[in-house]
Amino acid sequence: MPPRPRFDRRAPVRELPNINDRINYPQLRVVDADGEQLGVIDREQALEVARERELDLVLVSEKADPPVCRIMDYGKFKFEQEKKAKEAKKKSHQTEVKEVKMRYKIDQHDYDVRIGQAQRFLKAGDKVKCTVIFRGREIQHTALAEVLLRRMAKDLEEPAEVQQPPKREGRNMIMFLTPRKAPLVKKDKDEEVVNKAVRTIPSPARRINTQD
């Protein structure tokens, strides 16, 4: 029998950018870092100009005649391109509604698991539907389910804000959370204590002038 073909598991070779000595065209149309046209010059001359300015010669249009190169900081250019690609990918993300289901009698471990799931969904930019499922006569414990959902909203207040507070939906109790747009600003506990104390201090009694 012929030997079975072996799969090449090596990572694919990444195509190297056409910069500096990897540019093989003898004549190039060159643009400097400020966008100024340097005209059509020899490859060696273009490389020399780039070296003098401590920058890179980058091929930007291979199909042009002659090919067009630009003198630039390639490391900075690559960083900006990757940054733009990440921002474009982030903007193209379609917001989805992810659901986290639980019973109103949930133990701490399972509750922590649901919190972790919700945090991952919110971090990905998705909304979260928190659902408490009732079975049979459990429907009479909607108050406990509401307490559970409000506890979850409190535990997730940093990455999320409540889009829809707890409410009945059929035989379930639901709540919607959405990723928080602005960072949560928490009041300092000492400040809250002081403010509370100030509110409870009675106003001084008005003096009555008994003199004639």
Swiss-Prot record:
Keywords for the protein's UniProt record, in alphabetical order: Cytoplasm, Initiation factor, Protein biosynthesis
One annotated GO molecular function: ribosome binding
Chain coiled-coil ranges: none
Subcellular location: Cytoplasm
Membrane spanning residue stretches: none
Domain of life (superkingdom): Bacteria
Gene3D superfamilies listed in its UniProt record: Translation initiation factor 3 (IF-3), C-terminal domain, Translation initiation factor 3 (IF-3), N-terminal domain
GO cellular component entries: cytosol; membrane
InterPro entries: T_IF-3_C_sf, T_IF-3_N_sf, Translation_initiation_fac3_CS, Translation_initiation_fac_3, Translation_initiation_fac_3_C, Translation_initiation_fac_3_N
Primary location group: cytoplasm
GO biological process: ribosome disassembly
SUPFAM superfamilies (UniProt xref): Translation initiation factor IF3, C-terminal domain (SSF55200), Translation initiation factor IF3, N-terminal domain (SSF54364)
Protein function: IF-3 binds to the 30S ribosomal subunit and shifts the equilibrium between 70S ribosomes and their 50S and 30S subunits in favor of the free subunits, thus enhancing the availability of 30S subunits on which protein synthesis initiation begins.
Subunit structure: Monomer.
UniProt record similarity statement: Belongs to the IF-3 family.
Alphabetized PANTHER family for the sequence: TRANSLATION INITIATION FACTOR IF-3, TRANSLATION INITIATION FACTOR IF-3, MITOCHONDRIAL
Entry-linked NCBIfam families: infC
The protein, known as: Translation initiation factor IF-3
Record organism: Synechococcus sp. (strain CC9311)
Gene it is expressed from: infC
